[in-house]
UniProtKB/Swiss-Prot annotation:
Domain of life according to the entry: Bacteria
Cofactor descriptive note: Binds 1 lipoyl cofactor covalently.
Matching HAMAP family: GcvH
Name the record gives this protein: Glycine cleavage system H protein
Pfam families, alphabetized: GCV_H (PF01597)
InterPro entries with a match to the protein in the record: 2-oxoA_DH_lipoyl-BS, Biotin_lipoyl, GCV_H, GCV_H/Fam206, GCV_H_sub, Single_hybrid_motif
Amino acid sequence: MSTIPENLKYADSHEWVLDNGDGTVTVGITDHAQDLLGDVVYVELPEVGTEVTATEQFSLVESVKAASDIYAPVNGEVIEVNDALNDAPELINEAPFEGAWIAKIKLSNAADLDKLLDAAGYSATIA
């Protein structure tokens, strides 16, 4: 069974969002998503400074099974990426909620967070 931390918000496209409390969020993919993908071998990170639009592709994760687009869960600007994934994409499998975040985004509108699912809502989508 997939781990679904209560302190995060979720998109139904399997991204998690951590509200950093300063107008920024940290984004990654869920345990359920990495489990479906299998062993991750490559992560295409967005470029810092890129404007992202909620529900549009902003990253890519490749595994031994498939390549999967990663969708921005909020509108904003990429302010930081997790360069550790360039050398260790397997972190996505090993620690999807800890060391394997993909990007930090400066929110265009904090109300975007209200459109995301809580842990119970996300759990219902993958049940």
